[in-house]
Amino acid sequence: MARSLKKGPFVHYKLDKKVQENIAGGNKGVVKTWSRASMITPDFVGQTIAVHNGRQFVPVYVTENMVGHKLGEFSPTRSFRGHAGAKNKGKK
């Protein structure tokens, strides 16, 4: 289900404030955030945002193609190690 257009995109207010401070200051520092649900807006383009994946912060460099997506899409939370092979089937 898509978000209502009259509500606008969700961006955590502190994340938005930190990105605006980075832009105003002219520095390209990394902004840490736990807000994986925040939508990437055109203001974020060119910024590096460290998104928490539950264990560590994954740096995400925002490009124009990412606008409209959520930050959590670019910070995977699970690492698939593969199914058990023939070697591991009998051992326990």
UniProtKB/Swiss-Prot annotation:
One of its GO terms (cellular component) is small ribosomal subunit. Residues 73-92 are annotated as: Disordered. InterPro entries: Ribosomal_uS19, Ribosomal_uS19_bac-type, Ribosomal_uS19_CS, Ribosomal_uS19_SF. One of its GO terms (biological process) is ribosomal small subunit assembly. The keyword RNA-binding applies. GO terms for molecular function: rRNA binding; structural constituent of ribosome. SUPFAM superfamilies: Ribosomal protein S19. Residues 80-92 have a biased composition (Basic residues). Keywords: Ribonucleoprotein, Ribosomal protein, RNA-binding, rRNA-binding. The keyword Ribonucleoprotein applies. Pfam families: Ribosomal_S19. PANTHER family: RIBOSOMAL PROTEIN S19P FAMILY MEMBER, SMALL RIBOSOMAL SUBUNIT PROTEIN US19M. NCBIfam families: rpsS_bact. Belongs to the universal ribosomal protein uS19 family. Protein S19 forms a complex with S13 that binds strongly to the 16S ribosomal RNA. This is Small ribosomal subunit protein uS19. It comes from Flavobacterium psychrophilum (strain ATCC 49511 / DSM 21280 / CIP 103535 / JIP02/86). The gene is rpsS.
